């Protein structure tokens, strides 16, 4: 079965008494802006891998009986949902933010999934989704590989302006790494950059959101790229030392994170150097004001891997900074020593995974953390990949809105993840009937929704696929607004007073996310 080559795409454990302190709540999602779907191509290896991988990983792709799923009257569904708001008030979680930020590794908060934590997971998932929704996938555009909008317009354009955060800096990574299918390049000779891709952003909570969540939260969102086929084909499965003890990480991930070249416009400094410079600046800025500061890093797929590398560096560099990672469909990144160092540094990691998604099984499809049971015989194996942190495992079969059968792209889609988080209560219950997040978002870049919903697949795109009719009646690609054209000078010269003014707002924040 053919696959698309591209995908659109911290809380400690607490005791039961903590659960009793955290009241239950309800909430919902927001609307987003359109963008071009990524280009697709087929892989000759997919059909040969499908059956063997599904059997090997026990992905449970068969259609189960629907006796455990609440029945839906599809004739009434549309009318009922159209009259139901997709938002709800945000609760003040300031007194419990340490629990929501993994002071106890989210114990007693994941199964059943606490309502407040569900909201926070989806919030950070939406931050990661923004890196796909704003990305220019169009290989016929001179701006392919860049963000469509400047950082001041990003959240507003995507419908995220009321989430309580402002973007302070964009992150760029080298596109000439050793995994050619992982990053996007324009087919045109004259482009905004021949060497770099937009890989995410750094943001910070405004005053109103800071009061609600109990601290000044810095967020870093990393963009993912490839579909499951390229994970299998392109991963070099080569562990490389991080420079600290015995810790090693996958070579390709480290290359994207650390590569730079003085001859480039956007990567005279690496993605690592860019993000750490900005995070350090923000931490110092708000600590000088006497504020408590946290760092939350998020990403999907490849973005989840980069988030873990970023967390490792931040925790190693900035003393006493609470660092958490919330990742979606992320692969294994490093060896056991890398995992242990993250633990010693105090990094809290929550991995959201879908049982049928193959990417979290890679690299280390066969040789992974399961071999630790042999440590008494073999000793610690430094070449074995291992996952990090707590896991929230989801199942596509739990949702009555999702099709059954094999769909690698849909299983790995971030929107599928967010839909399942919104409906998850615990491992034994059915899909949450009161879930309000718009199910249409699932089909933004895949074909996962049941036909009864009448939502077209891959519907999320620019009007007329980005073409406009000019004064002469000809359909052409429009020029970007000058402020949306990537500029390394605009990127480097951040107006700090303007940023501070931008995050001081007295507007009452209205909810954008589901719970």
Q: Positions of the model-derived regions?
A:
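N-terminal low-complexity, Ser/Thr- and acidic-residue-enriched intrinsically disordered segments
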Residues: 2-210
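Gly/Ala-rich beta-loop-alpha elbow adjacent to hydrolase catalytic centers
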Residues: 299-303, 307
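Alpha/beta hydrolase fold serine-hydrolase catalytic domain that processes acyl esters and thioesters
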Residues: 2-5, 25, 84-88, 94, ...
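Short alpha-helical scaffold segments that flank and stabilize functional sites
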Residues: 128-131, 310, 314
């Amino acid at each position: 079965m053919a696959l698309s080559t591209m995908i659109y795409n911290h809380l400690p454990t607490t005791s039961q008494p903590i659960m009793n302190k955290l009241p239950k709540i309800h909430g919902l999602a927001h609307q987003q802006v359109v963008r071009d779907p990524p280009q697709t191509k087929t892989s000759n290896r997919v059909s040969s891998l499908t059956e063997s991988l599904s059997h090997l990983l026990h992905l449970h792709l068969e259609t189960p009986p629907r006796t455990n799923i609440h029945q839906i009257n599809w004739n009434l569904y549309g009318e009922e949902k159209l009259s139901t708001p997709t938002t709800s008030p945000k609760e003040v979680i300031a007194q419990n933010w340490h629990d929501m930020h993994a002071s106890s590794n989210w114990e007693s908060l994941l199964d059943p999934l606490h309502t407040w934590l569900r909201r926070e997971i989806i919030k950070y998932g939406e931050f990661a989704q923004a890196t796909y929704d704003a990305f220019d996938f169009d290989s016929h555009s001179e701006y392919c590989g860049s963000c469509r909008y400047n950082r001041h317009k990003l959240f507003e354009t995507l419908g995220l302006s009321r989430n309580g955060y402002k973007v302070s800096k964009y992150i760029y990574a080298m596109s000439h790494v050793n995994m050619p299918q992982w990053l996007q390049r324009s087919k045109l000779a004259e482009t905004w950059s021949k060497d770099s891709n937009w890989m995410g952003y750094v943001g910070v909570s405004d005053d109103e959101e800071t009061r609600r969540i109990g601290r000044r939260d810095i967020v870093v969102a990393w963009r993912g790229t490839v579909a499951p086929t390229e994970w299998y084909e392109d991963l070099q499965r080569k562990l490389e030392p991080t420079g600290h003890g015995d810790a090693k990480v996958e070579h390709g991930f480290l290359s994207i994170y650390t590569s730079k070249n003085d001859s480039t416009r956007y990567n005279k400094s690496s993605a690592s150097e860019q993000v750490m410079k900005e995070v350090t600046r923000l931490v110092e800025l708000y600590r000088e004001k006497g504020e408590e500061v946290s760092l939350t890093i998020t990403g999907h797929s490849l973005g989840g891997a980069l988030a873990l590398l970023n967390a490792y560096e931040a925790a190693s560099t900035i003393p006493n900074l609470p660092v958490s990672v919330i990742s979606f469909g992320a692969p294994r990144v490093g060896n056991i020593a890398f995992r242990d160092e993250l633990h010693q540094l105090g990094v809290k990691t929550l991995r959201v995974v879908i049982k049928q998604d193959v990417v979290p099984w890679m690299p280390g499809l066969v040789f992974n953390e399961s071999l630790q049971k042999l440590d008494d015989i073999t000793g610690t194996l430094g070449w074995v990949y291992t996952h990090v942190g707590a896991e929230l495992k989801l199942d596509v079969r739990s949702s009555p809105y999702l099709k059954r059968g094999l769909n690698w792209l849909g299983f790995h889609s971030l929107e599928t993840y967010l839909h399942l988080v919104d409906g998850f209560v615990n491992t034994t219950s059915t899909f949450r009937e009161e879930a309000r997040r718009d199910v249409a978002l699932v089909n933004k870049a895949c074909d996962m929704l049941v036909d009864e919903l009448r939502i077209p697949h891959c519907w999320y795109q620019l009007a007329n696929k980005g073409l406009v009719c000019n004064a002469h009646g000809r359909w052409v690609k429009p020029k970007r607004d000058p402020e949306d054209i990537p500029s390394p000078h605009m990127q480097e010269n951040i107006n700090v007073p303007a940023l501070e003014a931008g995050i001081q707002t007295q507007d009452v924040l209205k909810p954008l996310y589901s719970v």
